Regions:
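Alpha/beta enzyme core
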Residues: 1-270
Length: 270
């Protein structure tokens, strides 16, 4: 890895491939730029988020990390749409693209040299096919399906694959037996990267925490405090309005009575 890569781009796809099997990469999903800035400052090496125009500036603000934009499943209904969106995301600064579409779509993106991260295991938009929110790959048939799907993505040209809620032993074999850079989300610690969502790490919400996630902080408590402070501030404003506080010279502009009377006389003559 070249020094300028670390300073300007963070880990490139080239670097990630070279690091496979050598050390574990720390990867987080973010929802906000504030989360991304904190992740970068903490030493997180790989950051991802869904590709939306409101987030198109994130890579420029987060230079020095490997930045991945993700295509939301269902937003692109054809290979052409996925290709166009991926190219836009790369132009906006992404170094890799998460694509949960089929190997045939991934193959087209890969032929255009778009570095693709595929997805196997528990895929939230497709859970009806695997029986809901549960581990995928514990039985022989399911493990075989996960393995064969991973191999199809490898053949299609994906450079990496997210393994979500797949048995750790199965994820380990996929890591050892394929060229894919593997990313574990609830799939043990033997993959090439360990992945969690920032909302879970930070405790942004006081709601369901997936079994595979770990909450390190409870920021929702601080959010509640801030929310209550906002309510109190608005209530104080309402009270001040009701009590005509804004007539005070501190909050309004004064005018000489002579000038006012002159204006009134002018208006009355019209």
């Amino acid at each position: 890895m070249q020094e300028n890569n670390l300073n300007n781009f963070g880990l490139t796809v080239f670097d990630l491939k070279k690091l496979k099997g050598k050390r574990k990469i720390k990867f987080v999903q973010i929802d906000t730029l504030d989360q991304g800035l904190a992740a970068k400052e903490s030493g997180i090496e790989m950051i991802g988020t869904s590709y939306e125009q409101s987030k198109a500036h994130f890579p420029q603000k987060l230079k020095g990390v490997h930045f991945q934009f993700g295509l939301r499943w269902g937003n692109q209904a054809s290979t052409e749409e996925a290709l166009r969106e991926s190219m836009k995301a790369m132009n906006d600064g992404a170094q890799s693209i998460y694509c949960p579409m089929s190997p045939s779509v991934v193959e087209v993106l890969s032929k255009e040299e778009i570095p693709v991260i595929a997805h196997v295991g528990l895929i939230p938009p497709k859970i009806t096919l695997t029986g809901g929110y549960r581990a995928v790959g514990k039985s022989f048939d399911e493990a075989k399906m996960v393995w064969e799907t991973a191999k199809r993505y490898e053949s299609a040209g994906a450079f990496a694959i997210e393994l979500e809620v797949v048995p750790g032993k199965l994820a380990s074999e996929i890591t050892k037996r394929t060229s894919l850079f593997t990313i574990s989300l609830g799939s043990g610690s033997k993959c090439d990267a360990q992945y969690l969502f920032s909302a879970d790490i930070l405790g942004e919400k006081n709601d369901f925490l997936p079994r595979h996630a770990k909450r390190y902080k409870t920021l929702f408590k601080e959010h509640d405090k801030i929310h209550n402070e906002r309510i109190n501030a608005y209530k104080e404003f309402i009270n001040d309005v009701d009590n005509n506080l804004f007539e005070d010279k501190k909050y309004s502009v004064s005018m000489d009575d002579e000038v006012l009377n002159k204006l009134i006389n002018f208006i009355d003559k019209k």
